[in-house]
């Protein structure tokens, strides 16, 4: 297991499993969210806040986050923020 990235409100995602991070306001993103709800592959990590980004994982899970895609991309690229943990020993 690699690095865990904070996606908001104490929720963590393994960065080794992330395929893409996109903004949630496009029509294709909204369709993917609807499809994820239907197929029960959606994980809502927004804590009731507005969804701002959608994270796709390699095991076909769709994760919703209340953080901006730019914020998540910065954390993904190594600009460590509070709540990011390295699990490699």
What are these regions (language model features)?
Residues 1-12:
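Short aromatic-glycine motifs in intrinsically disordered, low-complexity regions
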Residues 15-23:
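Phosphoinositide-dependent membrane-docking surfaces
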Residues 26, 30-39, 44:
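Compact, glycine-rich, soluble single-domain proteins
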Residues 14, 28-29, 35, 51, ...:
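Amphipathic alpha-helical interface surfaces
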Residues 13-16, 56-58:
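Short glycine-enriched loop/turn motifs at secondary-structure junctions
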Residues 54-89:
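C-terminal structural segments of small proteins and small subunits
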């Amino acid at each position: 297991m690699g690095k865990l990235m904070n996606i908001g409100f104490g929720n963590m995602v393994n960065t080794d499993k992330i395929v893409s991070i996109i903004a949630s306001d496009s029509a294709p993103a909204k369709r993917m969210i609807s499809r994820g709800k239907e197929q029960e592959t959606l994980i809502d990590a927004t804590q009731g806040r507005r969804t701002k980004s959608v994270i796709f994982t390699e095991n076909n899970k769709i994760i919703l986050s209340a953080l901006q895609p730019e914020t998540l991309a910065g954390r993904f690229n190594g600009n460590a923020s509070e709540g990011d943990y390295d699990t490699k020993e």
